[in-house]
Amino acid sequence: MTLPLYDPAWLERMYNNRALVPDHMDYFERWARDSAQVRAHIPCALDVAYGTDVGETLDVFPSARTTGGPVPVLVFIHGGYWRSLDKSDHSFIAPPFTQAGFCVVVVNYALCPGTPDAPVNIPHIARQMEKALGWVWHQIAAHGGDPPRI
């Protein structure tokens, strides 16, 4: 069997998850609603810059446990096939981890394809994630996180 790797229609069917999940907007709306509630009710540092380029921000949700020293760090990179969604849609993932003693970092990045003046591709996003992890390594202790346990 040969896969139709160069058939644009086949590629569109395989990589267009929105078409495969007709009620995807219900999920997006629930994520956004639940995430807004999380940001309103648990301690967090929002829109912290890890760089100067478009999309280079992150949200930090410190551990709910305040004793026992530095805590492990969970870094969450949101999905969206590199072209949609935002870190603010995914704050809902933080509470179970912060309650279990983790510091949670939800990272944003520029979305493909960008603009004509500032194009974005997947290698660009990979470099942004390297930059974000560097920020976490150097700065997370200020939020109670333990850099060796990212």
Predicted features along the sequence, with ranges:
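Catalytic nucleophile-loop/oxyanion-hole region of alpha/beta-hydrolase
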Residues: 85-93, 105-148
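Feature marks short, surface-exposed loop/turn motifs that line or immediately flank catalytic pockets
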Residues: 64, 81, 111-113
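Short glycine/proline-enriched loop/turn "hinge" motifs that connect secondary-structure elements
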Residues: 66-68, 95-99
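N-terminal cap/lid segment of alpha/beta-hydrolase-fold proteins
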Residues: 3-5, 10-69
